[in-house]
């Protein structure tokens, strides 16, 4: 029970920090937020409850959507949908902000992932992104132990691949 409380507290603190860091705290209540890879909706609920945002969470997992709906009070402006992050069913510029935490590492096409998030973001909107990345492995080759860890993440945990922050930045700047 103690560890669960610590995890929840850390999750809430993390969301508040990412909101401040990304500028989402400048948005008015009622702003439309897309939570890409929402899981069971933890971040979505915090964004709706503490900031008054209207949050749409998407995940490819029907089980996660079901659980997110079970955990979310009808008083919160949150809705959850089963949807592929690489094929978002929203019009261009629908959202004031796009939020994505630890989803990109699961995407096999990082360019399409970025394209879809940026396409649904209104001009001048905010992108809040926190994810697993690797350093530039050509410039800074991994140690033997790091190679083993990467192998485990890619093969046993079935992550498609990791890219560096620099590589992801290039994708974003291409827009």
Q: Which residues does each PLM region occupy?
A:
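Conserved alpha-helix/loop element of class I SAM-dependent methyltransferases that forms part
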Residues: 9-29
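A short acidic, Gly/Pro-enriched loop at the edge of an enzyme's catalytic core
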Residues: 86-98
């Amino acid at each position: 029970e103690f560890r669960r409380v610590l995890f929840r507290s850390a999750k809430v603190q993390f969301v508040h920090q990412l909101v401040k860091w990304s500028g989402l705290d400048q948005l008015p209540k009622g702003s439309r937020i897309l939570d890409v890879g929402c899981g069971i909706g933890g971040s979505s609920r915090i964004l709706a409850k503490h900031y008054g945002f209207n949050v749409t969470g998407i995940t490819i997992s029907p089980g996660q959507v079901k659980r997110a709906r079970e955990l979310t009070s009808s008083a919160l402006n949150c809705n959850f949908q089963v949807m592929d992050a690489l094929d978002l069913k929203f019009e261009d510029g629908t959202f004031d902000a796009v939020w994505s935490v630890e989803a990109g590492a699961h995407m096999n096409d990082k360019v399409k992932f970025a394209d879809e998030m940026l396409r649904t973001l209104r001009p001048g909107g905010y992108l809040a992104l926190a994810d697993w990345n690797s350093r530039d492995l050509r410039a800074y080759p991994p140690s033997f132990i790091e190679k083993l860890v990467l192998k485990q993440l890619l093969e046993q945990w079935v992550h498609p691949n990791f890219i560096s922050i620099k590589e992801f930045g290039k994708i974003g700047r291409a827009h």
